[in-house]
UniProtKB/Swiss-Prot annotation:
Subunit structure: Tetramer of two alpha and two beta chains.
Pathway as given in its UniProt record: Amino-acid biosynthesis; L-tryptophan biosynthesis; L-tryptophan from chorismate: step 5/5
Cofactor(s) listed: pyridoxal 5'-phosphate
Name used for this protein in its record: Tryptophan synthase beta chain
Gene from which the chain derives: trpB
PANTHER family associated with the record: TRYPTOPHAN SYNTHASE, TRYPTOPHAN SYNTHASE-RELATED
Entry-linked SUPFAM superfamilies: Tryptophan synthase beta subunit-like PLP-dependent enzymes (SSF53686)
Signal peptide interval: none
């Protein structure tokens, strides 16, 4: 899907066991192992199948609306007075975020495997909407597991999923957020392995999911690289993206990993601060452990019990991160930094006011980091940020906090 990485490349992982260094792998129930191996086999065939790639490209152009534009944020750049700021406009995709890139790829795989039922987990509802969308497009039934807390704070997306014909199952276990939804989806999958395809929405889970999701999302970085060379004649100095599970981030990061002149920063959800437990900064404040089929950085207590975490953004409210991010952090290729709720909220308003773009709260975390860094950089330097989703789904959350009832 991308050009072949060099042997000593940062882009050559994972190995045949799905590991990025000590991270990744396949930690799943025995009943799932044959299915996982089957999926991996099908994925390996699809990667080198010109017909699969052609269909993916066709749907990308005619259904998703790719390539998404590269946009120079003129007023934000002027306001901050430093580096030139460019956005990769993934919020302009069909369904309003980067999630659809992966969903189209995976549903084509599900069809190749003869699966007749789709299940998915969702936090902010963006992946749920994208899954329900592709299921409708290909005429397959779809069940979406969503934490009860998220069902409440993401009402517009719940309605969209139902309109699209999906069954939304609220999950009340734990804190009723993304982790709990993923647990329920895995339970469903174990019970219905024969006919069901689990469409995971982030670059985590058991191998081959982290690799698969990354490859489907790498179209973001590959396009951005070409577009940046066309616009500026060179690569950016800095690439920034928000990181929850990490699919939009790995999608824009991966094509730039071997470009040593490009600094890369992933922005985690700092929530209400790193001192307590009300954040989702797995790399900044977590430790390695196993969750949802892979080894990665997690928010856990001394006994290895998973902490609940918190973020203003439902899509970043996950106590882990994709294993490739854990590895990239350990080897020092990517820096991961936290942004607090209040900073994201401020950035959300700043972008809306200056550029007429209402960003998703997830992307607002990345914008907040850009707002911090741009003024410290030279006017001849360039920042590329992944604007991963639009903020329609977040107006209720933001309205409530700002005291503007909707």
């Amino acid at each position: 899907m991308n050009e072949t990485p060099k042997p000593n490349s940062f882009r050559s992982g994972p190995d045949e066991d799905g590991r990025f260094g000590i991270y990744g792998g396949r930690f799943v129930a025995e009943t799932l192992m044959p299915l996982i191996l089957d999926l991996q086999d099908e994925w390996n065939k699809a990667k080198s199948d010109p017909a699969f790639q052609a269909e993916l490209k066709h749907l990308g152009a005619h259904y998703i609306g790719r390539p998404s534009p590269l946009y120079f944020a003129e007023r934000l750049t002027a306001e901050l007075g430093g580096a030139k700021i460019y956005f990769k406009r993934e919020e302009l995709n069909h369904t309003g975020s980067h999630k659809i890139n992966n969903c189209i790829g995976q549903i084509l795989l599900a069809k190749r495997m003869g699966k007749t039922r789709i299940i998915a987990e969702t936090g902010a509802g963006q992946h749920g909407v994208a899954s329900a969308t592709v299921a409708a497009r290909f005429g397959l039934p779809c069940v979406v597991y969503m934490g009860a807390t998220d069902v409440e704070r993401q009402a517009p997306n719940v309605f969209r999923m139902k309109l699209l014909g999906a069954e939304v199952k609220p999950v009340t276990a734990g804190s009723g957020t993304l982790k709990d939804a993923m647990n329920e989806a895995l339970r469903d999958w174990v019970t219905n392995v024969e006919d069901t395809y689990y469409l995971i929405g982030t670059a985590a889970g058991p191998h081959p999911y982290p690799e698969m999701v990354r490859d489907f999302q790498s179209v973001i970085g590959a396009e951005a690289k070409e577009q940046m060379l066309a616009a500026e004649g060179r690569l950016p100095d800095l690439v920034v993206a928000a990181v929850g599970g990490g699919s939009n981030a790995i999608g824009i990061f991966h094509p730039f990993l071997d470009d040593s002149s490009v600094k890369i920063v992933g922005v985690e959800a700092g929530g209400k601060g790193l001192q307590g437990d009300e954040h989702c900064a797995s790399i900044t404040a977590g430790s390695p452990g196993v969750l949802h089929g892979n080894r990665t950085y997690l928010l856990q207590d001394g006994d290895g019990q998973i902490k609940e975490g918190h973020s203003i953004s439902a899509g970043l409210d996950y106590p882990g991160i994709g294993p490739e991010h854990s590895w990239l952090s350990d080897i020092g290729r990517v820096d991961y930094v936290p942004i607090m709720d209040h900073e994201a909220l401020e950035a959300f308003q700043t972008l809306t006011r200056l550029e007429g773009i209402i960003p998703a709260l997830e992307a607002a975390h990345a914008i907040a980091e850009v707002i911090k860094r741009a003024p410290k950089m030279g006017k001849d330097e360039i920042i590329l940020m992944n604007l991963s989703g639009r903020g329609d789904k977040d107006i209720f959350t933001v309205g409530k906090i700002l005291g503007m009832g909707l």
